């Protein structure tokens, strides 16, 4: 998510992204809308459905200019990710009473997210399992 630091908050983009990744803070459940990732036509490659492209725009072609909209989308994704993970951690804290967290996987390598989580009043310790992939 290194590109996120070059982006800006865009309210309309954030609203679109909220529909892409839903989160219920009462149950701790989240879902990536499968219609935007898996279900539907894939005219732009295997990663993007046509519906995703309709909402967020065409993916960047190799060697093409890096437009600000890509950085803004990365910013919006980072923002959404941080909010979901921090809210989920708070939900887990309320469910278990634990103030210690263990993270693993590619998302756990996101140092901006980890810094934000570490600053939460309900967090005492975070262990991040270091052997993860980022694919």
Would you name each region that the model predicts?
Residues 1-135:
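Short acidic/glycine-rich loops and adjacent helix/strand connectors
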């Amino acid at each position: 998510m290194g590109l996120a630091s070059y982006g800006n908050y865009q309210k309309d983009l954030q609203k679109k992204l909220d529909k892409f990744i839903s989160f219920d803070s009462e149950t701790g459940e989240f879902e990536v809308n499968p219609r935007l990732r898996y279900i539907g036509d894939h005219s732009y490659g295997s990663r993007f459905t046509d519906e995703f492209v309709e909402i967020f725009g065409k993916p960047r072609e190799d060697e093409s200019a890096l437009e600000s909209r890509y950085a803004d989308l990365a910013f919006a994704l980072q923002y959404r990710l941080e909010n979901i993970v921090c809210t989920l951690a708070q939900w887990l804290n309320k469910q278990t009473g634990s103030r210690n967290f263990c993270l693993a996987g590619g998302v756990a390598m996101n140092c901006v997210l980890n810094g934000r989580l570490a600053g939460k009043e309900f967090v005492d310790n975070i262990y991040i399992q270091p052997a993860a992939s980022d694919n």
